[in-house]
Amino acid sequence: MKKAVVLLSGGMDSAAVIAMAQEQGFAVHALSVRYGQRHTSELDAAARVAKAQGVVAHKIVDVDLRSIGGSALTDDIDVPEAGGAGIPVTYVPARNTIMLSLALGWAEVLGANDIFCGVNAVDYSGYPDCRPEFVAAFQALANLATKSGVEGAGIKVHAPLQFLSKGQIVSEGVRLGVDFGLTVSCYNADANGAACGHCDACRLRAQGFAEAGVPDPTLYA
């Protein structure tokens, strides 16, 4: 069976991506990153999702982005209750580049040629590292920078949610049997994973379930 490394945050998008990769016949190795995020309950959610969806392995890697700072997700900066114009304060500098690089390294060790990530259409209007151009550029870099890219079959970066709305992601996840009740999206989630219901992540998540006509399983504080 082909191997793939899937970035798993513990949120609804990455849970759906795991199921999509498995449907394509990949043996999924899930990678989560403890980067200093304030909402650490998402890593607990990642462990739940990995177990429930039967991944081959789940690895959590520590990278202290809090020591660099620059984001409301790592610093003592208030998370806004509504999105605004421009790049939001919840953008973590270079986070997706760093996470994909870690996934790339693990893929090489595993002999895997495929990496999956959950960037999507809802995100790339505000986050520069969620744009299709970024995904294509990282794939090009991966094939220039690795032994697999130079001597092997090459690396493919999959972003299957790239052009899907949150509602479409929910519908696809439900079709594939994803238990979204295990996931955490909230930027202000408490230690038990209960969501605030007010931040931008909560708003987009709720809209997704409403759009899909699916009951919202989110635990709210």
UniProtKB/Swiss-Prot annotation:
TM region(s), chain numbering: none
Record note on cofactor: Binds 1 zinc ion per subunit.
Residues holding ATP: L8, S9, G10, G11, M12, D13, S14, A15, A16, V17, I18
EC numbers for this chain: 6.3.4.20
Cofactor(s) named in the record: Zn(2+)
Pfam family, one: QueC
Annotated InterPro entries: QueC (IPR018317), Rossmann-like_a/b/a_fold (IPR014729)
Pathway info: Purine metabolism; 7-cyano-7-deazaguanine biosynthesis
Annotated GO MF terms: ATP binding; ligase activity, forming carbon-nitrogen bonds; zinc ion binding
UniProt keyword annotations, A-Z: ATP-binding, Ligase, Metal-binding, Nucleotide-binding, Queuosine biosynthesis, Zinc
Catalytic activity: 7-carboxy-7-deazaguanine + NH4(+) + ATP = 7-cyano-7-deazaguanine + ADP + phosphate + H2O + H(+)
Binding of Zn(2+), residues: C186, C196, C199, C202
Biological process according to GO: queuosine biosynthetic process
The family this protein is said to belong to: Belongs to the QueC family.
Purpose of the protein: Catalyzes the ATP-dependent conversion of 7-carboxy-7-deazaguanine (CDG) to 7-cyano-7-deazaguanine (preQ(0)).
Name used for this protein in its record: 7-cyano-7-deazaguanine synthase
Native source organism of the sequence: Stenotrophomonas maltophilia (strain K279a)
Gene behind the chain: queC
